[in-house]
Amino acid sequence: MILVTCRYGADLARGVLDLHARGIFVLNLKPCNFLLDEHDHAVLGDFGIPSLLFGLSLPNPDVIQRLGTPNYMAPEQWQPNIRGPISYETDSWGFACSILEMFSGIQPWRGKSPDEIYQLVVLKKEKPIFPYSLPAEVENILSGCFEYDFRDRPLMSDILHAFER
């Protein structure tokens, strides 16, 4: 199961990287937005948020603050005016939340309300629980995705590299 999830992670990282190369943020990465194609490759679905923002060079922080699913939102999505603007690294946080859920079967902050998640993620700086026995390189890169300063998170190209090994 770990190898399959790593393969899906690489597929998804490639998809996100392709969108980033086109100047598009995803901002709502979560397992229910992932699909499997006829060749058992994971692909991204649901482009509602990127479509909404397509063509806007600097999205309004008030709009961004309301976009995303709380269990997968990076700190700057909750408070863009305080924590910095959204960036490609914002997608790194959502990607890592999604992959941890795929490895463990447990949604990050499951059972918590949006207000509780805000308290845990933004104010207490809590990070999701990691399952045991992840490959070291994958665990290291995912851990880096949860840095609170988005500038310290890995880029999707770094994530892809870790998942391709």
Predicted features, each with a name:
Residues 37-70:
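Activation segment/activation loop of eukaryotic-type protein kinase catalytic domains
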Residues 104-108:
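Structural helix C-cap motif within protein kinase domains
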Residues 8-9:
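Activation segment signature within eukaryotic-like protein kinase domains
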Residues 146-158:
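A conserved short helix/loop substructure at the end of the activation segment
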Residues 133-146:
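Conserved C-terminal C-lobe helix
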